[in-house]
Swiss-Prot record:
Its cofactor is Fe(2+). Its EC number is 1.14.19.2. Binds 2 Fe(2+) ions per subunit. Belongs to the fatty acid desaturase type 2 family. The lineage of its organism: Eukaryota, Viridiplantae, Streptophyta, Embryophyta, Tracheophyta. This is Stearoyl-[acyl-carrier-protein] 9-desaturase, chloroplastic. Residues 1-35 form a transit peptide. Coiled coil: none annotated. Fe cation 2 binds at residues 179, 232, 265, 268. Converts stearoyl-ACP to oleoyl-ACP by introduction of a cis double bond between carbons 9 and 10 of the acyl chain. Pathway: Lipid metabolism; fatty acid metabolism. It holds the Pfam family FA_desaturase_2. GO terms for molecular function: metal ion binding; stearoyl-[ACP] desaturase activity. It comes from Spinacia oleracea (Spinach).
């Protein structure tokens, strides 16, 4: 999925504007469950991690659940036929989908080792900071079980049985199946590159899936589909920018991989934004209130609870590198918001309640206010320190 913006490199802790990263808080870990391992630790921090329970590296927000009234749930049930005709068309048949092996050396071929050597030669030209971003993107994609779980919390649109034939359930399962290829492909390619510490990466993935995510969507599909619309757009932007940078550094295969993943994300973005477009059509007041609510909460990115067993602020550090490289920035955040405001024609809404009008004004005025902070973000980034990343064998990268 996508990245977040980092308070180290972006000064978004303004009272009047939302920040774009989770609130920095002390770690809160349950005393009940503790990790055990027979492996020796290579650092005091890792030794300490062995005693930590299965809980996020930072506090999550107070959980609000099932905030949507029954009459709104009925709206989603009534949209079952609409979803079948308008949502499922954005899925591709499995036989027409690309698969990771299409872009990887064939291990059964006689020149497999030569192909791997070619990948590793190209990998030498990729700088460490781009590897940090590529690995962070891959880890985000690999936490797919969390995202399917999140979608299946949405009242009126969840998969009630695990194999429900409803259009909403079919979409969620098939979307998950398409997304599953992304992490598989990035993981295998980065493994073959020889430039990254796969054990550290695999630990980070396990920690992240175990921690879950905290999107604050309240089991409410109005909130949930605003969130996924933003996220798919952000992921499209992020992978697209990674493709551009990989190409600039001479790895055309990595550029191709990031590009095809971005193409999938764009198709998924189209589907999710179409859902919210329909909600604006049939229930504009509740939908604009949901849009404003998610923006006031600040869109927390899917991997915001990322942890490698050592760095409690790993996601912030990863995000700072992405911001500095131009992979995902404060400007992108504002651009995505402005895109969605235009896509859903929020400025043209009429007949809203007084609260709906306030929400409309809020989301429409927010993008230019965010953009005014971009220059300050760039200035602060110039003074950022360097940090070691376990994913690249503790090599130092400027934040």
């Amino acid at each position: 999925m996508a990245l977040n913006l980092n308070p180290v490199s972006t000064p978004f802790q303004c009272r009047r504007l939302p920040s774009f990263s989770p609130r920095q808080t002390p770690s809160r870990r349950s005393p009940k469950f503790f990790m055990a391992s027979t492996l020796s630790s290579s650092s005091p921090k890792e030794a300490e991690s062995l005693k930590k329970p299965f809980s996020p590296p930072r506090e999550v927000h107070v959980q609000v659940t099932h905030s949507m009234p029954q009459e709104k749930i009925e709206i989603f049930k009534s949209l079952e036929g609409w979803a079948e005709e308008n949502l499922l068309v954005h899925l591709k048949p499995v036989e027409k989908c690309w698969q990771p092996q299409d872009y990887l050396p064939d291990p059964a071929s006689e020149d497999f080792r030569d192909q791997v050597k070619e990948i590793q030669e190209r990998a030498k030209e990729i700088p460490d900071d781009l590897y940090v971003v590529l690995v962070g993107d891959m880890i985000t994609e690999e936490a797919l079980p969390t995202y399917q779980t999140m979608l299946n919390t949405l009242d009126g649109a969840k998969d009630e049985t695990g194999a429900s034939p409803t259009s909403w359930a079919v979409w969620t399962r098939a979307w998950t199946a398409e997304e599953n290829r992304h992490g598989d492909l990035l993981n295998k390619y980065l493994y073959l590159s020889g430039r990254v510490d796969m054990r550290s990466i695999e630990k980070t993935i396990q920690y992240l899936i175990g921690s879950g995510m905290d999107p604050r969507t309240e089991n409410n599909p109005y909130l949930g589909f605003v969130y996924t619309s933003f996220q798919e757009r952000a992921t499209f932007v992020s992978h697209g920018n990674s493709a551009r940078l990989a190409k600039e550094h001479g790895d055309l295969k990595m550029a191709q991989i990031c590009g095809i993943i971005a193409s999938d994300e764009k198709r998924h973005e189209t589907a999710y934004t179409k859902i919210v477009e329909k909600l604006f059509e049939i229930d504009p007041d509740a939908t604009v209130l949901a849009f404003a609510d998610m923006m006031k909460k600040k869109i927390s990115m899917p991997a915001h609870l990322m942890y490698d067993g050592r760095d409690d602020n790993l996601f912030d550090h990863f995000s700072a590198v992405a911001q500095r490289l131009g992979v995902y920035t404060a400007k992108d955040y504002a651009d995505i918001l402005e895109f969605l405001v235009g896509r859903w024609e929020v400025e043209k809404l009429t007949g809203l309640s007084s609260e709906g009008q306030k929400a409309q004004d809020y989301v429409c005025s927010l993008p230019p206010r965010i953009r005014r902070l971009e220059e300050r973000a760039r200035e602060r980034a110039k003074q950022a320190p360097s940090m070691p990343f376990s994913w690249i064998f503790d090599r130092q990268v400027k934040l």
